[in-house]
Amino acid sequence: MTFDPAALGWRAMRTNPMPSSIGLPWAKRTDNNWQYAFLTTNEHANPQGAVHGGILMTFADHTLGIYAWEAAQRAPCVTIQMNTHFLAAVTPGDFVELRGEVTRATRGLVFVRGILAVGDKDVAAIDGIWRVLRARPTG
């Protein structure tokens, strides 16, 4: 039987080509917040057979950046620091979900943290800082 995120209330996200290269991202609104997810495949595996940590970090960077972007009133943001603590291995075929939150936002910086999970199992804890890019006055 094939896993279908849409059957669980997830909807496919439109995104730019870079994050979609790791797979179609999914989004779901819960408790006045968004969650994001992607379905891992054999192409994401490292030589040991687990999903490569870089794949998980790329997904976390992109989706936590969405939280920062929303907190910055949709002004462009760039990652200036991101810390990842791996807690458990992810197996190809796992559906990886990210739950995130903005912990602080200033005019120029947004602080975000999140948990990557497979079902009830936390697999990584991430925190980071995003710089808000604002147009500079000309003249």
List PLM regions with ranges.
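Terminal targeting signals and extreme-terminal segments of soluble enzymes
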Residues: M1-G139
